[in-house]
Amino acid sequence: VKDGNSEARAGFSKKLVNEMMAEHDPRVRAEILKCSAGFDNPSARAICVGGLDDPDSLVRIAACDAWVEIGGDEAIRHLANRFRSDEDIDVRLHAVRDLGSLENEAAIPVLAEALEAPDPAIQFRAVASLKEVSGRDLGNDVNAWREWAVDPSAYREEWSVAEVWRQIF
């Protein structure tokens, strides 16, 4: 169906919407989400948006992953909202990870916000995602990344002989 014409894809996506709404098994809903991410039409997009608010965390995680495939500023907005509002730590961690997977600098403010989270797992995941987005490696020091995130364009690393030796050994 993905290779078919746009009418066939739209019709299939509408069937997926009905399946998503009727399905009780979260594993099946998660698979429907994965399938929907590959279609660029309103019905498929509605499945991906709705999946973010599913009662089951497995489906919300699948929705986060679907937004990585979709990409763009809309994906950043939805993943940021999921990071900020979800009560399940696994979903929040996936949202932060997926923000990094987008490799879009527009995600930096949200990832900087994640550095301020009280949970060290969120902070660690935010550091890993900032490494992906920025292409830099400031180590795992959350404070160094906080400093960098304030103004990424102005940040420059201090060069020292000691730092060169540390990197060698």
Describe these PLM feature segments.
Residues 24-25, 55-56, 87-88, 118-119:
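Short inter-helical turns and helix N-cap capping residues of alpha-solenoid HEAT/ARM repeat scaffolds
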Residues 115-120, 131-134, 146-151:
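TPR/TPR-like (Sel1-like) alpha-helical repeat modules
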Residues 6-21, 41-53, 72-84, 104-116, ...:
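Amphipathic alpha-helical scaffolding segments comprising HEAT/armadillo-like alpha-solenoid repeats
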Residues 138-169:
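Pro/Ala/Gly-rich low-complexity, hydrophilic intrinsically disordered segments
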Residues 1-2, 37, 68, 100, ...:
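Structural signature of alpha-helical solenoid repeat scaffolds
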